[in-house]
């Protein structure tokens, strides 16, 4: 018991936070991240709760995606973050809601600007740092949307997306670059369809515009304008 008490006393007296090192940040400053964590210089390094700090970061700084917090003895706390860089816009009742490919609402805006638009859906009770939710009857469209956004991100194709349309109950369509409308089914293998899309575009003349139909399994079709 004496040894345990001495160990606890040592942890309390020593290992005070003298510096907080933040890496991976661009949108938020290191000080903003430290403040959001709730860490102050002089706090005990071992009495800080890492799960609580991660939760506060996600709640207070919506663009934070992944967080890794480590202790570096004797007195440094390291916070490594990744931030969401691609967002999409849903316009609803005069407000533009910006959301990530993972379905997190990160910001509101008065105007959409050049952010890719998602239409044909309605957000239920949207709130900052909250998760996107569609009406129950649109759950299939919601799941398909975020499966597509995840696939676009993995394929590094997000920069060419101009808009995604969910208004048609049978076909999900996407405005891609300034040249194409891409038609896809809901609940599809989107990584595979995006590979088809890339191959089709590579075969087309650079001045062609039109519709790329990916709704027929394994048989892409191009309809020129």
Which residues are covered by each model-predicted region?
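Periplasmic polypeptide-binding modules associated with outer-membrane biogenesis and secretion
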Residues: 3-7, 15-26, 46-99, 146-149
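Envelope-exposed proteins and targeting segments
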Residues: 16-18, 29, 53, 60-65, ...
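Periplasmic/extracytosolic POTRA-like scaffold domains at the N-termini of outer-membrane
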Residues: 23-63, 114-143, 187, 192, ...
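Flexible glycine-/small-residue-rich
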Residues: 24-26, 37, 81-85, 110, ...
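Short beta-strands and strand-coil junctions in structured, solvent-facing domains, enriched
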Residues: 42-44, 65-66, 75-76, 85-88, ...
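Extracytoplasmic segments of membrane-associated envelope/inner-membrane machinery
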Residues: 82-161
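Soluble extracytoplasmic domains of inner/organellar membrane proteins
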Residues: 137-192, 198
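Extracytoplasmic/luminal low-complexity segments enriched in Pro/Gly and acidic/polar residues
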Residues: 178-225
């Amino acid at each position: 018991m004496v040894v345990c008490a001495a160990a606890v006393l040592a942890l309390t007296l020593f290992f005070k936070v003298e510096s907080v090192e933040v890496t991976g940040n661009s949108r938020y400053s290191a000080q903003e991240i430290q403040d959001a964590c709730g860490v102050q210089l002089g706090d005990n390094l071992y009495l800080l709760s890492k799960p609580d700090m991660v939760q506060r970061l996600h709640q207070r700084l919506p663009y934070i995606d992944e967080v890794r917090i480590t202790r570096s003895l004797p007195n440094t706390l390291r916070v490594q973050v990744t931030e969401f860089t691609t967002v999409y816009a849903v316009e609803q009742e005069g407000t533009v809601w910006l959301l990530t490919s993972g379905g997190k609402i990160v910001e509101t805006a008065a105007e959409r600007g050049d952010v890719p638009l998602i239409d044909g859906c309605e957000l239920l009770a949207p709130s900052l740092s909250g998760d996107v939710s569609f009406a129950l009857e649109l759950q299939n469209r919601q799941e398909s949307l975020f499966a597509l956004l995840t696939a676009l991100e993995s394929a590094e194709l997000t920069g060419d997306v101009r808009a995604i349309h969910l208004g048609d109950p049978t076909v999900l369509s996407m405005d891609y670059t300034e040249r194409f409308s891409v038609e896809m089914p809901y609940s599809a293998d989107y990584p595979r369809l995006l590979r088809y899309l890339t191959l089709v575009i590579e075969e087309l003349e650079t001045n062609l515009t039109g519709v790329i139909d990916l709704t027929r399994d394994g048989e892409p079709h191009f309809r020129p304008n």
